[in-house]
């Protein structure tokens, strides 16, 4: 699926993240773990922020100056209504130029929708966008080798890809970052949380 097709899928299912069916605790414990590695609150970017606002709310309570980015206009419209004081970017992370370096970047359940051929380049971009000592948390498919698949999600097609854990770890090292945490947090599902820090 192309980025435009991913945006169309999320436009169609955007209301799910505002419904009682969505677990607003999803990913929060993992973010709290990642935030322990941050020396002090500064600037933060939520990549693929979606509409729920739960990660943005957590970062605001920790006194971060937060920005959000999403490719779905409908998701972002809902996010803006929830947090009108936050700067949001309607953009494709594949082509978006980060306007500055950040002390914390979240890419929770988002960059695995990036086309496989571009995935490691996007990760390199995010790593380069970290301030010294900055921390990133992101999710990936827990595969050894590159894989991609399109499956139904809430009645819509949704693409996921993984460059493979070995390639991701090499990219972290090459990008001047240390892996601080790697966890198959929904085992036996292949959902992996990674936390890395710029050295």
List each model region and its residues.
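Class I (Rossmann-like) S-adenosyl-L-methionine-dependent methyltransferase catalytic domain
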Residues: 1-43, 50-100, 117-121, 125, ...
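Helix-to-beta-strand junctions that scaffold the AdoMet/dcAdoMet cofactor pocket
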Residues: 114-116, 130-131
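Hydrophobic adenine-recognition pocket in adenosine-nucleotide-binding enzymes
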Residues: 110
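A conserved beta-strand element that flanks and buttresses the S-adenosyl-L-methionine
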Residues: 106-107
């Amino acid at each position: 699926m192309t980025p435009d097709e991913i945006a169309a899928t999320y436009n169609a299912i955007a209301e799910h993240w505002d419904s009682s069916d969505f677990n607003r605790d999803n990913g929060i414990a993992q973010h709290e773990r990642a935030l322990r590695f941050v020396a002090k609150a500064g600037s933060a970017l939520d990549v693929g922020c979606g509409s729920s606002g739960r990660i943005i709310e957590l970062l605001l309570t920790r006194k971060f100056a937060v920005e959000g980015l999403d490719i779905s206009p409908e998701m972002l419209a809902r996010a803006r209504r929830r947090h009108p004081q936050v700067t949001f970017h309607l953009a494709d992370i594949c082509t978006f130029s980060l306007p500055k370096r950040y002390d914390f970047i979240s890419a929770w359940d988002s960059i695995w929708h990036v086309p496989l051929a571009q995935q490691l380049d996007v990760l390199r971009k995010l790593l380069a966008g970290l301030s010294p000592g900055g921390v990133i948390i992101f999710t990936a498919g827990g595969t050894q080798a590159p894989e991609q698949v399109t499956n139904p999600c809430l009645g819509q097609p949704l693409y996921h890809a993984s460059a493979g854990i070995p390639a991701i770890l090499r990219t972290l090292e090459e990008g001047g970052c240390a892996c601080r945490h790697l966890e198959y947090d929904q085992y036996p599902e292949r959902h992996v949380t990674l936390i890395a820090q710029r050295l």
